[in-house]
Each structure stands twice: as C-alpha cells, then as structure tokens.
Amino acid sequence: MSVILGSGEHRYRVVENWGKLPDGWSFKDVAAVGVDSKDQVYVFNRGEHPVIVFDRDGNFLRSWGEGVFQRAHGLDIDKNDVLYLTDDGDHTVRRCTSAGKVELTIGIPGKPAPFMSGEPFHRCTHTALSPKDEIYVSDGYGNARVHKFSPAGKLIMSWGESGSEPGQFNIAHNIATDDAGWVYVADRENHRVQVFDGNGKYETQWNNLHRPCGLYCCRGKSPTFVIGELGPGMPVNLKAPNLGPRLSIVDAQGKLLARLGGKDGPGLEPGKFLAPHGLAIDSKGDIYVGEVSYTNWKTSFPDTPQPKTIRSLQKLARVP
C-alpha cells in the first residue's frame, strides 16, 4: 500500500526506489536536484558522477561533471535549461549547458575569500536568478552574505552579515526568487526564511520553521513554496517530536499549507526523511527530494552503525 503524505490539496504519494542507477554506481549525498523543460531530472551529488540525469520515470539518461566538481551543494535551472551549480568545496558557481559544458565560472576554484569577510565566496551554497537573469548567490558557510551578479558574472552588490536581526544570517543555506523579483533566503540556523527586494532591502520573514535547508519556489502570480527542514542536531533534543526532518508547503506570505513527514523524527521508512537538502518540482507537480543522508547519519543515529548504502533521493508524486 502506498504511503501518502500531506493534506488537503497538497497530498503526495511516496514513489519507492525511484531513480535506476547503472550497476555499481551510487549517489552518496544528493545535495541538489533540478528539473528542466523536458522534465529531465538532474541530480547533483557527491559520488563519482556528480551530475546524473534521469527521465521523470527514473530511467538513467546520462552523467557528466566527472573531475570538475569538488563538493556538490546547490543547483538551479533557468528557463533555457541552463544549469547553475554551486560547489562549496572549491568556492565557485559554474554555469553549464544541459550537456555539461562549462560556460561561466564565478569565483576562483580552491581560493576562498577570508572567513566572514563578506567578499565572494567562502563556501557558497546556492543560486537563484532575477527576472533579468541576474545571479543571486547565498554565501552561507564561511560568510553570512548574499551576492548579486550580472548575467556575465560581474559583482553588482552584496548584503548581509552574521547575526540574528533582520537582514543578518546564521548560515544562508539556500536562495530562491519569484516572478516579481522578490528574493527568499533560507536562514537555516536562525530557523526562518527572510524575504528581500531585488536590491537586498528587508521586507519580512517567515517563522514556524525548523532549520530550513531546501527552498523551492513554484512560480506564478500567487506562488507557493516548498521548504526542506532538517531535524534536531543536538543530543538533548534529538528524539523530540514535530521538529522534522520534513517538508513544509507555504504560500507567498509564509502561511503554512501542509506538512509532509517529520512528526516522529528521521528514518529510512517510506514517508520519512533523513536530511532534505535540495528540492525540485516537475511539470506534473511531483516533488524530487535530495538528501545528504551520509553526512547526516551520525547526527540522526549516533548509536547505530551506518549502512553501506543509504537512500538519498526520493520522489513524491502529487495525488490529483
């Protein structure tokens, strides 16, 4: 019997064992997922084949990026099926064709900016595009910053600093934009999503979240958002209920519409998550969830030996 998550208009069926890899291949952590105009699913992962492409039924199509990336972290795909891949291991953002040709590199591979200097980049995390194809980059692990670049990769401006006040960040982990040009930043360890105009002016924030990690905007005049939330990261609250890991669906004002999973902690059973890190949605409304399961295992299950293979990619099919 299929497992159904969510409620009301936001119900999803768990598609078990989605994504058929060639023999001997593995994802390791799936840091990010993207879907192009043909509903091809790009899986940006930390295995030997960094970009693996499937059709929406999970059939393997191709791979690329071998020898290019150091540590996969973020992926965004534009309307022309151009990919923006964020590598926090070598402090770069690469713009690539759907076949894997690198067209632009922002940042100097292997040369981070000084820690918390505010200069790009020190372990950048994700990208998003403005309606004018300007490139926003969340720079969240070694900085507390959002950078705005021209389509050619020239720095226009930056904003943010370490802290918990509006406009400050404690791990700017993910970033998204909508068709009106608003910028949404998953401020992970401040447990919120902050909303800015296209030039970094603070507008509002969404709370009622727990360590928001993945962030996806379902575009349109009244967009909804899917937010991947990590579970507790400390031994004292590790087994506390209702804190994730989970997905939350909210409207453009941050009002909660549905929650998927997360009531009784992490797990490998259908309907549970380990560490939802990257999100994408196809033309049918199905959700693809990339999880950093290997990285998270010891946090979630400190007393359980790590399995050799751990699920790190899920598909949730929307229920009509």
Predicted regions and their residues:
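Eukaryotic scaffold repeat domains enriched in small/polar residues
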Residues: 1-320
